[in-house]
Amino acid sequence: MPDNVLIHAIKADITSLTVDAIVNAANTSLLGGGGVDGAIHRAAGPKLLEACRELGGCLTGEAKITKGYRLPATFVIHTVGPVWHGGNHGEAELLASCYRNSLKLAIEHHCRTIAFPSISTGIYGYPVEQAAAIAITTVREMLADERGIEKVIFCCFSDRDLDVYQKALAAG
């Protein structure tokens, strides 16, 4: 990975971050929901919902992009993480795909800074320790030869999640 790429974890409200793109842990409809998805839709305003309606949904592991509207972020990248079913149903590969496809869209749109929530670890039940390891490994692999992205933020909701991400970053 290029030395100029900064990857770190913070505890913050992802909707308040001034970055080129924030990632939304969405559901397949892209029409808003609970958790970070609902918070992003509320903060971005009704034009985000209109834009998401036009996208026609999103498959698990895929990603789609919209403007940020009323958010400080220029773009919102919507990705649909897997629901945890014990770990033997392709969840790890689907979760890695969320990060890969989100980064691909960010690179295509010339984003230099991107913030990710902890995808699938809320109501979808993915164990945070496993999700953090997949997130960090996938991001590092994707950025190994990439020169466009300068900063990746893992934006954590709780102190516990932040601790897990910080330990995973330090270990790797």
Curated annotation (Swiss-Prot):
Which ranges does the record mark as transmembrane?
A: none
Give residue ranges for domain Macro: 1-172
Question: Cross-referenced CDD domains, in alphabetical order?
Answer: Macro_OAADPr_deacetylase (cd02908)
Recorded hits in InterPro entries, A to Z, give: Macro_dom, Macro_dom-like
One Pfam short name: Macro
The family database entries (PANTHER family) matched by this protein are listed as: GANGLIOSIDE INDUCED DIFFERENTIATION ASSOCIATED PROTEIN 2-RELATED (PTHR11106), MACRO DOMAIN-CONTAINING PROTEIN (PTHR11106:SF27)
Which family, according to the similarity comment? Belongs to the MacroD-type family.
Q: What is this protein called?
A: Macro domain-containing protein CT2219
